């Protein structure tokens, strides 16, 4: 097992800009959305028009099993333009707005989902984030008090470096913190005043198709969350993507998946050090694309885009994950876990220039004591919209 120990270069002050949250059903710990005792009623899916000729859109799926329209598309909310590469999106801290990014177009679409959650309203379009922020390739949207952090993959011209950009809740530019080189995802541990970011490739390489391996990042960066100062850098395997902290104020570790290294790493903060260790080496071509940690910190879910499956690991010993269940999902991609840890939604589109020829769908995996099972009643077709075929990527619960 390879390990890289990183010494923090500054004492981490306690996060004092806002109280440390107890937890969230969103990637951002600051989002106040569903509680564990609440069943989701809606699933939002950020969706690309497959041929790029029509506007991209937010798909609204009925997720209430008591509803007569359960597991069907009940609405769509179009953007003001097509060809965006609808990739990731995220809530504001109050879950009243969705910030949805065009990875290739640099557009930002802000949707109101507070007024009528079943019918999102496009409240604002920012036509060029590169012009307003100085950076391009909006990827992760991570809510913080007073706004949203956006992980920008590259500079204004599509090269290096990437950055973490803060926007206010109306999408106005606040500030930018340049990365050493690459950018992909953001994860914050407010109790430690620590932010971790990851790597992929720069926009001008991603838009051409599969980026050459020498143009793909392997760096993970630790930041002072309050000041935006880089504290440390680590080099793992190629394309360390999703930053997933363990849940709860006392947690000091997390997981990150290296897509092109076919590996999963665990990190832990202890005695002033941040250390990374490779804990899973998967088969060549597996391409771990997304990860979710159950809210009781018992299980890690990993989607394998290349292998076409979702795996569930027991992480009671985080440094030694144990496979407990696996289900086949062609081109398994983004996942969304419910706060009660019982349902795992999964999409199957990665990127327009990387996807294979598979039927596009959103599926539901039921998680129980015996492991995972695909729900035959929840199989949502993305092949037959009014505008034709569409590609589902990121998802949010409501």
Residue ranges and their predicted role:
Residues 92, 180-183, 187-311:
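Beta-propeller domains
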Residues 60-69, 110-120, 169-170, 266-274, ...:
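Short loop/turn segments immediately following beta-strands, especially the blade-tip
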Residues 284-362:
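Loop/turn-rich, solvent-exposed surfaces of beta-rich toroidal or solenoidal domains
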Residues 116-190:
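Asp-box/WD-like beta-propeller blade repeats and closely related beta-sheet repeat scaffolds
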Residues 38, 45-52, 151-160, 198-216, ...:
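Short, conserved, GDST-rich strand-edge loop motifs in beta-rich repeat architectures
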Residues 25-34, 38, 80-93, 130-144, ...:
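Beta-rich, blade/repeat-based domains predominating
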Residues 70-142:
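Blade-loop segments of beta-propeller domains
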Residues 73-79, 123-131, 172-178, 229-234, ...:
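A short beta-strand motif characteristic of beta-propeller blades
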């Amino acid at each position: 097992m390879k390990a890289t120990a990183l010494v923090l270069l500054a004492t981490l002050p306690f996060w004092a800009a806002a109280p440390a949250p107890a937890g969230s059903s969103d990637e951002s710990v600051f989002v106040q959305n569903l509680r564990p005792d609440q069943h989701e009623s809606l699933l939002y899916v950020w969706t690309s028009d497959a041929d790029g000729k029509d506007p991209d859109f937010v798909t609204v799926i009925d997720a209430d099993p008591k509803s007569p329209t359960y597991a069907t598309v009940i609405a769509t909310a179009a953007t003001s333009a097509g060809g965006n590469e609808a990739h990731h999106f995220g809530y504001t801290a109050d879950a009243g707005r969705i910030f949805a990014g065009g990875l290739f177009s640099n557009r930002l679409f802000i949707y109101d989902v507070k007024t009528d959650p079943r019918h999102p309203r496009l409240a604002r379009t920012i036509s060029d984030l590169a012009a307003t922020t100085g950076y391009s390739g909006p990827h992760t949207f991570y809510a913080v008090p007073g706004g949203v952090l956006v992980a920008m993959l590259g500079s204004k011209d599509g090269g290096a470096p990437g950055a973490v950009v803060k926007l206010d809740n109306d999408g106005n530019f606040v500030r930018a913190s340049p990365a050493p080189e690459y950018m992909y995802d953001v994860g914050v541990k407010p109790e430690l005043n620590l932010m971790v970011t990851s790597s992929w490739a720069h926009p001008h390489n991603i838009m051409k198709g599969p980026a050459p391996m020498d143009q793909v990042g392997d760096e993970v960066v630790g930041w002072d969350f309050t000041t935006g100062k880089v504290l440390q850098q680590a080099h793992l395997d190629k394309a360390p993507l999703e930053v997933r902290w363990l849940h709860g104020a006392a947690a000091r570790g997390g997981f990150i998946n290296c897509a092109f290294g076919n590996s999963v790493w665990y990190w832990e903060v202890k005695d002033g050090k941040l250390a990374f260790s490779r804990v899973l080496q998967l088969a060549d071509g597996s391409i771990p694309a997304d990860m979710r940690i159950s809210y009781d910190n018992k299980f890690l879910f990993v989607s394998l885009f290349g292998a076409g499956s979702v795996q569930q690991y027991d992480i009671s010993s985080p440094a030694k994950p144990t496979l407990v269940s696996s289900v086949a999902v062609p081109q398994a991609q983004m996942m969304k876990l419910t706060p009660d840890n019982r349902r795992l939604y999964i999409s199957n589109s990665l990127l327009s220039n990387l996807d294979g020829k598979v039927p596009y769908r959103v599926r539901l995996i039921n998680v129980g004591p015996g492991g995972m099972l695909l729900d035959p009643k929840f199989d949502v077709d993305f092949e037959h919209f009014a505008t034709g075929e569409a590609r589902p990527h990121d998802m949010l619960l409501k």
